[in-house]
Amino acid sequence: MESYDFIIIGTGVGGGTLAYALRNFGAKILLLERGDFLPQENENWQVEAVFKENRYKPKEMWYSHTGQAFKPGVHYYVGGNTKVYGAALPRFRKEDFEVLEHEGGTSPAWPISYNDLEPYYTEAEKIYRVHGKAGEDPTEPPRSSEYPFPAVPHEPYIANLMDKFRKQGLHPFSYPMGIDLREGGKCIRCKTCDGFPCKVLAKSDADTCVVRPSLENPNVTLWTKSFVKRLLTTSDGKRIESVEIEKDGQTLGVKADTVISACGTVNSTALLLRSANSAHPNGLANKTGLVGRNYMVHNNTALMAVNPLLPNPTVFQKTTAINDFYFKGPGFNYPMGNLQLLGKLQAGMLAAAKPFMPKSVLQAMANRSVDWWVMSEDLPDPENRVTLGSDGRINVRWQANNLVA
């Protein structure tokens, strides 16, 4: 049985960045990814392939607490969900780490503070090529240095919109974005960034920024198409000693001194529960029964602001956000949330969600809309949880809360 110092399960922003941080210390590291490298192909930038055919989503289904099957928003590739994310890389606010009272209840404090993480935020912004501008957002936490790269310039339509917001007393700011707009960089500011894979590898995803650089070190190994079935403990159940992997139709075992599960909230939970044994009958690390509980996903709304008299010619739209209501709003003394621009919506994207609406109507809307992502916080609820069915299927129970914001 092969042996490593570290086994890292998952190659997304968590697992990939950890491998990058460990790469130069001489430790023998194995990265395990259940998928493969996402191919660079014309379909990367085709609306129908990405949004209608779901080309890059897995075929597996998860299930709600009512038993209804749904296709999860996960992407099993090297780089994980960062392969298709919108490239927004903001820091949490200082207060986010503290006890925060919401209209619907209390958001408990983290065991660490913003100040504990600030140096690591600074380093991560360098690694992920973050473009931004300090001093524009009134909720911004303290920084030890400027952003490593200047803010992404706003296109004229968006710049004019920001001026109108400022005249109303709001503080739109340049949203921190992880894209390669360095001198000689690959980014072409296209309309197929948010929600799409980047065909030219200009998005600051975990694949391009941390996994591939880590693999330049001979002590770092990547196994793709490697599904981790179980974590196996010593006979007394006190430590994990090996990982059971399904690869190329075979079941393999690999040992490690340290095993890190970084395969996402739901899949890490499922892995711990699948790994139940006589010493841990309810799953690993689950004496309290809390594994999988208090599942949170934010309260999210995609909003199109349509002016029928004013076309929006913007191509790269996702450059600004508003946090004026982050901690409270007019007549509402509780946190409300964040407004940020989406990548420019296209008619084909709308058609994938509303297939029975006339395409001419969807095209007219997309041509004249400014597209927003409106996000507020949900709160921990032990009944919102991830469980496994008797057949091993993943069940997710999530009931929205804190909706007044």
What does each model-found stretch correspond to?
Residues 6-31:
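N-terminal Rossmann-like FAD-binding beta1-loop-alpha1 element of flavoenzymes
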Residues 40-44, 81, 87, 96, ...:
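Short, solvent-exposed loop/turn and secondary-structure capping segments
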Residues 65, 101-228:
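Conserved redox-cofactor binding core of oxidoreductases
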